[in-house]
Amino acid sequence: GPTSQSPRVDEARNDQLYELEIALREIETNRATYGQDMPPWLVDRTLRNILVDVTGNTHRSEFSIDKMFSPDSSTGRLGLLELRAFEMPPHAHMSVVQQLLLRALIARFWKAPYRAPAARWGTELHDRWMLPTFIQQDMHDVVAEMNAAGYAFDAAWFAPQFEFRFPMVGTVQSMGVELTLRNALEPWHVMGEEGSAGGTVRYADSSLERIEVRVTGMNESRHVVTVNGQPLPLQSTGTTGEFVAGVRYKAWNPPSALHPTIGAHAPLTFDIVDTWM
């Protein structure tokens, strides 16, 4: 989320992508001007005020260049790019396949820089791209692109990451309709300042959770899926008869939360309703 340790460049401010595009054009212009003699610190000066979080922190960014080539100190000139959105996998094999993907991406972009225009996702960033079905589709696109570029990858190599990050809650079949529940991603936002005995604190609202509901074999005109009696706004995945929705719910009631007057929604009850019967 926007207040995490590794927010995306387009996650907190809507104008950041516009500024990033200008910065990248400037880097291209300077490369054409200086060639191999381009000063390394120019990259730092060009991007350091863009690769930041909402408060301007240069370290808390998905791509942190604090230690790449900052002229401010010797510790800032280490040639390091931190990819802070990665977490340590629970198994060495999962770590190896992540490293293999990164090395292949670097090799590919070194030969052919990636020049596709940046997408303006808007609210889809926290709607579509928090759900495992669409993230898996996106990962399959990446694997297909890498294979087309001559780097042999298999989507099955990343199945453990998918199952680890989005564990299955359960599945049920009824009337030819299959309903699958998986844990999805949900940002825990940092809230406003509050006083405490030790000074000022800012809590994170950890009360929210998200579940993905995926339905296959459903007839739109006949079946409705509900959660606690409320119909779900299912969206097509592009596959006939397959639909997906994300359910955000309040799992518990902490003393400090974003909406303190809304009670906990758990437990959740999902129903497949046949409107013809």
Which ranges hold each PLM region?
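C-terminal accessory/tail domains of diverse enzymes
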Residues: 1-277
